[in-house]
Amino acid sequence: MVATPDDPRAQTIVDLFNGQGSAPAPFDVLTSALSFPTRDQEQWWRKTGPMFGQMLASSGYTLDQQYRHLTFYYNQLVPRLGPHPATFHSSLTVSGLPMEFSINYQQKGAHPMVRIGAEPIDSFSGTERDPFNQIPPAEMVNHFSRAGVKGFDPELYAYFEPKHSLTREQQARLPKEVPGGDKLKTQYAFGFDFKGDEVSLKGYSYPGLKATMAGQEVAKLVGDGVKDLKNQGKLDCTEAWAAVEAYMTELNGWGYHNLWAWDYVSPAKSRLKFYSFVMDVVDKTKLEELWTLNGRATSPAHQEGLRHLKELWDIIDLKNVGKRDLPADAPQIPEDAAPMVWNYEMTAGNPLPFGKGYFPLQGLNDAGCIQKLVKFFELMGWKDLAAKYPETIQSFYPGLDLSKTSHLLMWVSYTYSEKTGVYLSIYNHPCPEK
């Protein structure tokens, strides 16, 4: 919905086209012209939209692209974020909010890429009518299937959804049988990558929960799907999966925490990703084991990636961060532990998976984390980024003293490939007053 010609808000647009006044940010222009069908949507837009807009601007998107992606956010995501304040705890994010923002930096990329992770929510999510929020994700898939989003293909969602979804009986048992199960009610989520003019989508599911509640082995549930996709002639990642499966068994990495991910493209072009959690990465020897799947993935690209990963490990220094400032109701991390999330990416025709490590920053002083990231940027030779980064992050959170906060930077993830070189993503809290 837009402002009508006699609406005083429309004057802002007229002034801009007439060259009067200084040009406001795209978010402000849109806000002056748009209207909202509900107060919830208006609140999500006003609370999170400025940061998304600033991320786009600071990452080098053209003015046209900023308007394009902000409009996408307004039209496609804001209406699907549910009540404000949030009433459903999403297990996709550390904050429990239905979305998180991140920026990806690539050694061989043109400019940073802004991303959003989101779980669509509505007012019934978490209630007895839809306790595990299964309906809004399905509706979002159906919507994008009809919306003409370039390259969007729902086939893998249609394949995995019936295999990874909890039944109502399993949903009823989960809070009692899984630690923290009362907050583990996310079934499906989405990732949005804003690449130039386009938006690409990723999907996430929770086969670990399904296998646990169904009395199955996670390895069999996921592995059977990988093999079946090959047998159907749609996607062959069986060799890479065999390496992941063998290493997860050695690591004892199976459990209710396992996530799964794919791309919303034709299956043959999709990546598959398997996620696990390691409570304590004790040293760089363990780090190397995780990166190479205990010697199973040692290509030249893996070795070069390992070199930079060790540099990042030394700088972040998870083993010596001290006590984290975490909410009382959040899982508490022992001071001497170095927990990490890992995923392993598999693609058709490549027998070697590539790992990605996630360093948790939540509970650590934000200004201190920023300085560590600046140090890594300098080590990589990213001088302009290093010089501007503190100011850039401050622009996301105007009015906050980042030397006194510890919840704005959530994660930094690292991977490497021949195509991208170092591939670093930093995850930010989208609504810090939460």
From Swiss-Prot:
Report the EC code(s) recorded for this entry: 2.5.1.34
Q: Does the keyword Transferase apply?
A: yes
Q: What does this protein do?
A: Nonribosomal peptide synthase involved in the synthesis of nidulanin A and derived compounds. Nidulanin A is a tetracyclopeptide with the sequence L-Phe-L-Kyn-L-Val-D-Val and an isoprene unit N-linked to the amino group of L-kynurenine. The NRPS nlsA is responsible of the synthesis of the cyclopeptide and the prenyltransferase nptA adds the isoprene unit on the L-kynurenine residue of nidulanin A. Further modifications lead to additional oxygenated related compounds.
**What pathway does the UniProt record associate with this protein?**
Secondary metabolite biosynthesis
Disruption effect? Accumulates the unprenylated precursor of nidulanin A, but none of the three prenylated forms, including nidulanin A and two oxygenated related compounds.
Q: What is this protein called?
A: Tryptophan dimethylallyltransferase nptA
Does the record bear Oxidoreductase in its keywords? no
Q: Which family does it belong to?
A: Belongs to the tryptophan dimethylallyltransferase family.
